Amino acid sequence: MGLQACLLGLFALILSGKCSYSPEPDQRRTLPPGWVSLGRADPEEELSLTFALRQQNVERLSELVQAVSDPSSPQYGKYLTLENVADLVRPSPLTLHTVQKWLLAAGAQKCHSVITQDFLTCWLSIRQAELLLPGAEFHHYVGGPTETHVVRSPHPYQLPQALAPHVDFVGGLHRFPPTSSLRQHPEPQVTGTVGLHLGVTPSVIRKRYNLTSQDVGSGTSNNSQACAQFLEQYFHDSDLAQFMRLFGGNFAHQASVARVVGQQGRGRAGIEASLDVQYLMSAGANISTWVYSSPGRHEGQEPFLQWLMLLSNESALPHVHTVSYGDEEDSLSSAYIQRVNTELMKAAARGLTLLFASGDSGAGCWSVSGRHQFRPTFPASSPYVTTVGGTSFLEPFLTTNEIVDYISGGGFSNVFPRPSYQEEAVTKFLSSSPHLPPSSYFNASGRAYPDVAALSDGYWVVSNRVPIPWVSGTSASTPVFGGGILSLINEHRILSGRPPLGFLNPRLYQQHGAGLFDVTHGCHESCLDEEVEGQGFCSGPGWDPVTGWGTPNFPALPKTLLNP
């Protein structure tokens, strides 16, 4: 049956399911560890579904990102506005008309869009949703560190074939809330000795990365930073105030968040959320800070999508955003990954610096046809974000040089090819590293990550008014490098009349690690088998897929990144 016949029968197909296709045939639908099913959802219960509408001019958007992010380009720093981006990628009138008419015919009347018009979120009853999406069958699930409740379908859904040119995927059916990169160790026992520290605090970070008490925001510039929180994780103002009383006495700082975008819950504070806010605001001290709160319960079925839509609905945004969450690439559909990557590209075109944690599973490991392979994570593997790995002190209780934190995520994407900006650095690593794993374990031609690193081991956090030691993970290193260090550099750039850093990677790789401490010792974990025996990639001189170009050396890094 041809496309015209499918179009003529579009609304009858809502019920019949003929001329249908699966937008996400490769989406993994197995239940993640720690989640349990509570049974079928009530047919009259309401849920929200997010329809990702097909965008236009994505290739042109990619060209513009390259132009505004490359210091050698005459367009460098001339970022697009949200309205510019909307004009470029807005779905065609045919797409908007076709999808809206289809939804109205199905009874979906409570829908709202975003400024770019490429997402449409609708509230429907379970009964309506299952008729609209043949094959879907919604169940209640509970799980995750905060016992989050979600509604998902364990079965694949179909769309009318006539919608294939118009809809990338439907969010809110399969993907569970993303995982966090965070772990907590028992507190080590050590006898008190002069010069020792008993965990990473703002003063330890400032000492290691050469930040002085004067390296803080001016409080007068139009500078801001943000972190995103999911999984019903919330911070408490009282925890932030106590953290600053305990650890912020030797530098100027702000003791409250400037703005919360989304829904800030009233429940117990989460360690993840507390960590993000406290170290973002102590490394990037005295800089206006926003928190994006996307719990993924009532506001939207998929919290990460909810955050992306918030970015597409605000004209004036913080310059730097840090995110400490991710999923394995192989757990996500190609349609979802490619569309999210385009959303990250949109942010880069607008001059936003997005930093993602590289994860806490080293190179990762999974079995394909009985053979082990490394397991990259996304969005850490996106070519349009700056990914942050993790390090530890060489001597755990002294402020020394850094080595690899063995859990630091890193590797090579199985989805995205290697971007041109890192061609030289990655080629050099692959040709010179004496400790490469067998080639069958990784895709040597893929986007390689992380790009940079920072301390990720042994942090102090205040949560629910209790100081908690030895919290670790790239969830810790990301706000330190991203919001903190880069926001301070943006402060200097803005005060001198320059644009903010924007998408950092093209410039970062052109500088060949200038302004960073090179981390050259240590390897991260991987598959426990006879071939690699638990060892993934190892660090070495220059860029490597464990710590990237290294960790920040503040006096040198601003000099590198201030001009042009």
Curated annotation (Swiss-Prot):
Glycans are attached at N210, N222, N286, N313, N443. The active site is at E272 (charge relay system), D276 (charge relay system), S475 (charge relay system). The keyword Membrane does not apply. It catalyses: Release of an N-terminal tripeptide from a polypeptide, but also has endopeptidase activity. InterPro entries: Peptidase_S8/S53_dom (IPR000209), Peptidase_S8/S53_dom_sf (IPR036852), S53_propep (IPR015366), Sedolisin_dom (IPR030400), Tripeptidyl-peptidase_I (IPR050819). SUPFAM superfamilies: Protease propeptides/inhibitors (SSF54897), Subtilisin-like (SSF52743). Transmembrane segments: none annotated. Residues 199-564 form the Peptidase S53 domain. Keywords: Autocatalytic cleavage, Calcium, Disulfide bond, Glycoprotein, Hydrolase, Lysosome, Metal-binding, Protease, Serine protease, Signal, Zymogen. Lysosomal serine protease with tripeptidyl-peptidase I activity. May act as a non-specific lysosomal peptidase which generates tripeptides from the breakdown products produced by lysosomal proteinases. Requires substrates with an unsubstituted N-terminus. This is Tripeptidyl-peptidase 1. It comes from Pongo abelii.
